[in-house]
Amino acid sequence: KTLYPELNYADRIVQEGAFGADASPTVKPVKKVVKSQPDVMDGLGLNYSKGESILQMIESLIGTEKFREGVQNYMNTHAWGNTVADDLWRALDEVSDFNLSAMMKAYLEQPGYPLIHISKDGKLTQSRFHLAGATVEDKTWAVPLKLTYQSNGKILNEVVFIDKETTVLPQLAEADWVYPNDNATGYFRWSIEPAQLNALLNNIDALNKREKKNVLYNYQALLNADQVGVDSVMKVLNSLAKDDDPAVIRAAVGVLAEFSYLVNEDNKAAYAKLLNQNYMPLLNKLTLSQSEQDNADVIRLRNQLYSLLGTHSNNDQLVEQSVKIAKQYLADTSSVPSGIAGTAIEIATRNSEQGEQGTWFNTIVEAFKKAQLPNVKSTLVYSMYFEDKATVFKMLDLALTDDITPANTMYMVVRVARNLDDHTLLYEWLSKNKDALLAKMPDYHVSRMPEFVSTTCSAENLEMANAFYAPISETYQGMARGVEIMQDESQQCMRLKSAFQADFNAFLNEQL
């Protein structure tokens, strides 16, 4: 954050990148037995993001200076030698007043993370966070809570450790509201009573931008765990969508976009009306032109709004504008920022008339072959959105050519899968070309292919996926694990869809 302040890295809540995978009932702990290459790669991304999150939590707990001192002592003590994890915790123990070793043992040797519920009488209970309908083995953690709460008109702060299923903090019984995650550095989820949530939202400016985003992300997670309803999430979302900070508004837009799995033929018109009414004015205010004065948060907000509205607003004017931007980018790839250009290409190709798809495809591929910069190539080829059989097969065939590197081959297949609500065309092509595709992709991508390509929220798509992978999953090392993850994530999405579709429809109807 010192070298590149424009990236606003300090405002990013890194644990959000770990929470989703770490909530799965099939997740493995960071510290696990490794016997093969797939064991190394299994959960590799989670290990890094969870590890970073835990270290950030420790730094926040003991202070940056003490954290640096502990890390420097650790590096000096073990210079040119080998270490184990306990060596780092021991070094940090020596510069802090906390038993970090005990805390780390649970976080690294157990899968998952805790959910802390704070009752109005000051009773705190912890359980293992899990998604709706999932069955997991319950665990407990030693959890550092950095509390912020309002009592008798004063905002107070304190740090407490809870390591039991139930803990009572009498001081919280008198609180108007409680926020248990100061500066949003904790690796846990939390919930409070509805009355306290209302009071917190009424005093939301007592929190900084990280904390505001954490409230929203936390309630979206509670919805996915079936701990709260759609109305609670929308209450938080609507409050933060009015914030003055573009980073906070962007968080609200991002959470709203996560409800896209509930958008269907029956409610898409109501959803489009909501977007045009509440969010199109904001995009119009920002415009689709990037200026030198725009900071990173404004740029990201514009890109996210444009993507959401372009996908779901069904706005003819926005489509027309997107076609112009896409053609401008194809003529001169330096004339439009890649974030805007990619969305424009997606909207233009998605809304292309029957008979125009081939022309769009050929023009984009021609520009792709001429382009020299990798980011330009990616913007061009991975933004295409076609659903007709001929062009879908052209996109997939392109993945097998020398124009697409082995490392990027799977991403074209992923793009096609995400474009299609019905995966019939995808598996028709895969059945004919699986040998060539699997031979071209790196082994790591072969093992992860089910997870990335075939995870779905459709029972019909999952049935096709299971039929496709059944004869080959044991042939390729690690693929069976990828199938397990695909099945778990797909079934979870379908459970959420079943649980919340009616509530989401009711929310949309209330907005009409």
For the regions a language model picked out, list residue spans one by one.
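Long, ordered, helix-rich scaffold segments
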Residues: 15-23, 44-50, 125, 134-138, ...
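Hydrophobic alpha-helical and helix-loop surface patches within well-folded domains
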Residues: 1-137, 152, 258, 262-285, ...
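Short polybasic amphipathic segments
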Residues: 143-149
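Short proline/glycine- and polar residue-rich coil/turn motifs
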Residues: 162-164
